[in-house]
């Protein structure tokens, strides 16, 4: 049984994190520290703070808050995520993440919400996300009906992926063909991507790197995200090229920046420092957060807030 002091500290920590997340006077890296800490907590406090943050003026923070709500699979967040998805004043990267979160939560009641945006949202990346989310929910429903093990369970990387990995008996060559095939459906290509990620190895990484030339910005951004999970230096040159390309979609450059932060060699760090001044805020803030995370890691400290006593608030 927890002591009263322990409960009090936890309550104070939660309050501190919620306030820090929505405090626009704080550096973006500090707000991300709060966000990454809150996604490990449950209940109305963290949920409501993340919902509020999903409409923040920082599109990077807003989209990460929506992503966190999806990873938490909190059904109570569905009305707020629907509102974000339907708000055309919000950046497509935020609406996309709301759609993905609805797919991650995975309830059948989200189908009509997603179908509406699939047919009406002006942004291709949002429509493609709705397509993925609908297929994920369909797959989950089929698994429940057949009482079989799910292909949409949490990945070895502890993430709720927008698609389950393709069948494990597929070869790397077969998966590569599917991933690079522009005539295949988005869900099938995502499934190949996650199967290649789970397979690992240089041949699989090479196939993933090659798919950064895909015509879909949504797929390219997921590819960069996966390369960050794999932390493979094989991808360094291609990720650097993506970050440097000012004509690339900000959501793709942002994921490339985060992936470079995961690789964290001298060249990656130099690039992050250079592009932390990029005119596109999504890119600049991604670099700033990645550099801050590396600074904490190199000093042996956790980027997330963990307190054994009440946090000091100045």
Curated annotation (Swiss-Prot):
Belongs to the deoxyhypusine hydroxylase family. Pathway: Protein modification; eIF5A hypusination. One of its GO terms (molecular function) is deoxyhypusine monooxygenase activity. Fe cation 1 binds at residues 63-64, 96-97. Keywords: Acetylation, Hypusine biosynthesis, Iron, Metal-binding, Monooxygenase, Oxidoreductase, Repeat. GO terms for biological process: peptidyl-lysine modification to peptidyl-hypusine. Its EC number is 1.14.99.29. It comes from Arabidopsis thaliana (Mouse-ear cress). Fe cation 2 binds at residues 221-222, 254-255. Binds 2 Fe(2+) ions per subunit. The modification N-acetylmethionine is found at residue 1. It catalyses: [eIF5A protein]-deoxyhypusine + AH2 + O2 = [eIF5A protein]-hypusine + A + H2O. HAMAP family: Deoxyhypusine_hydroxylase (MF_03101). It holds the Pfam family HEAT_PBS. The keyword Zinc does not apply. Catalyzes the hydroxylation of the N(6)-(4-aminobutyl)-L-lysine intermediate to form hypusine, an essential post-translational modification only found in mature eIF-5A factor. HEAT-like PBS-type repeats lie at residues 61-87, 94-120, 188-214, 219-245, 252-278. The keyword Glycoprotein does not apply. Its cofactor is Fe(2+). Signal peptide: none annotated. This is Deoxyhypusine hydroxylase. It is an enzyme of class 1 (oxidoreductase).
């Amino acid at each position: 049984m927890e002591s009263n002091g322990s409960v009090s500290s936890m309550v104070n920590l939660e309050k501190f994190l919620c306030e820090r997340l929505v405090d626009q006077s704080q550096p973006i890296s500090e707000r991300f520290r709060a966000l990454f800490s809150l996604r490990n907590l449950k209940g109305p406090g963290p949920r409501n703070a993340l919902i509020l943050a999903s409409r923040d003026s920082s599109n990077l923070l807003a989209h990460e808050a929506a992503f966190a709500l999806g990873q938490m699979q909190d059904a109570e967040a569905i009305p707020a995520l629907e509102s974000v998805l339907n708000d055309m004043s919000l950046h497509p990267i935020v609406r996309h993440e709301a759609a993905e979160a609805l797919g991650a939560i995975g309830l059948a009641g989200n189908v009509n919400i997603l179908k509406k945006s699939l047919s009406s949202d002006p942004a291709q990346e949002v429509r493609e996300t709705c397509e993925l989310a609908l297929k994920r929910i369909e797959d989950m429903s089929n698994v429940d009906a057949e009482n079989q093990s799910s292909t949409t369970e949490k990945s070895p990387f502890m993430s709720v992926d927008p698609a389950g990995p393709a069948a494990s008996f597929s070869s790397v060559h077969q998966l590569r063909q599917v991933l690079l095939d522009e005539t295949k459906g988005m869900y099938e290509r995502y499934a190949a991507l996650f199967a290649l990620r789970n397979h690992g190895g240089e041949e699989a990484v090479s196939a993933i790197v090659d798919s950064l030339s895909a015509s879909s910005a949504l797929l390219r951004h997921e590819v960069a995200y996966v390369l960050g999970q794999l932390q493979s230096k094989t991808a360094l040159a291609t990720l650097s090229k993506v970050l440097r390309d000012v004509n690339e979609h900000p959501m793709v450059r942002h994921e490339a920046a985060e992936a470079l932060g995961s690789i964290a060699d001298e060249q990656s760090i130099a690039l992050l420092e250079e592009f932390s001044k990029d005119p596109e805020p999504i890119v600049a803030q991604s670099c700033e957060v990645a550099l801050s995370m590396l600074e904490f890691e190199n000093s042996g400290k956790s980027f997330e807030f963990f307190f054994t006593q009440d946090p000091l608030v100045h």
